[in-house]
Design a protein with these regions (language model features):
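Structural alpha-beta junctions
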Residues: 234-243
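Phosphate-handling DNA/RNA-contact segment within nucleic-acid enzymes
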Residues: 69, 118-214, 229
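Short, surface-exposed amphipathic charged segments that create phosphate/polyanion-binding patches used
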Residues: 205-210, 251-264
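TOPRIM metal-binding catalytic domain and adjacent DNA-binding surface shared by DnaG-type primases
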Residues: 1-24, 28-35, 46-135, 156-157, ...
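Acidic glycine-/aspartate-rich tracts in secreted/extracellular proteins
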Residues: 38-40
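Short, acidic/turn-prone active-site loops that include or flank metal/cofactor-
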Residues: 194-199, 220-221, 245-248
């Protein structure tokens, strides 16, 4: 995180979306980068939108920034090899991965597939974010005790996906690393975006590179999740369908923890009609 900004937290949630994770606030309290609510000024990192806070009356609206300040807050982008070395230094023993997954109600094999590791110094899990070629472009952390989420300094947006992905024509797209792990635990060919509105171009490139013909987008059961799923579907040149967990279930991980089986997932997904790409409508 650049020194001019700090991560939101449960004590200081995002003033725009009111969530305790993913977003950042400038240290002077004048601006916020929200990763869920759009403004007319996308963050240069490609992840989130900038909102002028002022006295709180303009949160969620577009803003005009001082260009010199805006440019000065962009952290440098290290080569992906640096992230690879950093991540490799963390504990990736199978027993550790099994324990981390168990603590979240997930299958250890899914954490092994995603190469989830443990950073003892920060007491957090490390989830690598990858570009469509599989190179690590950043690291997402999740604190073991508090669940707080943040990214390694200099990280660029990427996808949560297995090091050795399946070669199938159908792809399941989720939101976040633990939802991706839940989908992988069911034996699905899955990748995850870092948030409900990010990663559209990354998914599009991945679909092209892997020759994917159909995508099932699993949306979080909230307005931002469903809006983001529809925007992603509209941007992809393949057949798509959007699956929302049943009422009372927040997301894919919650659904899996409540006993979802592969048969039940397939039945729920197959009840939804495939939608043609927008360019063919």
């Amino acid at each position: 995180m650049n020194s001019n900004w700090h991560n939101v937290s449960r004590r200081e949630p995002c003033p725009v979306c009111h969530k305790p994770d993913w977003c950042t606030i400038s240290n002077d309290g004048a601006m916020c980068v929200c990763r869920r609510v759009e403004s007319d000024r996308p963050a240069r990192s490609g992840v989130g939108w900038i909102h002028r806070l002022g006295n709180g009356s303009t949160a969620g609206m577009g803003c005009v920034l001082n260009p010199s300040f805006y440019n000065s807050t962009i952290p440098p982008f290290p080569h992906s090899h640096n992230f690879t070395l950093l991540h490799a230094a963390f504990d990736g023993h199978p027993d550790m991965q099994e324990g981390l997954a168990f603590g979240l109600g997930l299958d250890g094999a899914s954490f092994a597939a995603l190469d989830v590791r443990y950073d003892a110094a920060k007491e957090c899990m490390s989830f690598p974010m990858r570009n469509p070629q599989g190179e690590i472009t950043g690291l997402r952390y999740r604190h073991l005790a508090t669940g707080r989420k943040w990214s390694e300094k200099g990280s660029r947006d990427g996808l949560f996906m297995p090091r050795e992905p399946e070669r199938t024509e159908h792809l399941v797209i989720t939101e976040g690393p633990t939802d991706t792990a839940a989908a992988l635990s069911l034996g699905l060919n899955a990748v995850g975006r870092s948030s409900c509105l990010s990663g559209v171009s990354l998914i599009r490139d991945l679909v092209h590179a892997r020759q994917i013909r159909r995508v099932t987008i699993v949306a979080d059961h909230d307005r931002p999740g469903m809006d983001g799923a529809h925007r992603l579907a509209a941007a992809l040149p393949v057949l798509s369908r959007i699956l929302v967990p049943p009422e009372g279930i927040k997301d894919m991980r919650d659904w899996y923890r409540q006993g979802l089986t592969r048969t039940q997932f397939d039945e729920a997904a197959n009840a939804i009609r495939w939608q043609l790409p927008h360019r063919l409508l």
